[in-house]
């Protein structure tokens, strides 16, 4: 666990509530004149290990960014390199490795994935400047379940890849590339006429709308499979960790199945969907979400497949039924 340390006296009180699920601590923003052994003593008193620390340095500061999320760029790499150099002196990498052992995946799930892997499906996966927010673990799980990943660019390519069975539109910044996406009319038409299962998360969902706004509030033509408009607001909309329950069967979920997810966006839609019901982790808010009809599953929630492999089992069952028709 990484902990910012503003005042040494507050460290023990803060860590106290995490001792049942945290084994080791890395302390961040340490003042240069602080006694590291004193920090180590306070951490050890709680039965935890101090495996590293990072001194406060203005060179490590990262400016605020749209959504708080960063795509690869030169200045970020420079900061990362500086932090890496410092951590090479202050972080016990052996202890970090020892405390970071990954829990083995469920054997039954792994066996089932191997059995399914014999059935190959080609999945077009959007990945470019506008669509770059995805869990790499999702790619791994998709491949385990027999999907051949074919990456493509909604900005630069003229149409979808050939002979694909599924389309996955990941999250990203379509609003920052609205003009480029909208002007690529051949791609819009290719997606609209694809007639294959389409999964769209957040940014991908925005792109599927009949129209969507850019960051300046200008409206642009979208794919048109979601009959509404995605528009910018002045604050975060329905953000946080949530649990989603399906209201009926769809290409990814069956009625009453549940998954955990999250939403994090400044955009809203005139067509958010009511296929599923979402409840925040702290039970403070709840709302309807996701458009799921025919062969579409699209909404603001981000999907994480590891642990929810039944989503792919449902998708494969749908593909098999379509093949038999």
Predicted regions mapped to residue ranges:
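Phosphate-binding active sites in nucleotide-utilizing proteins
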Residues: 119-183, 187-193
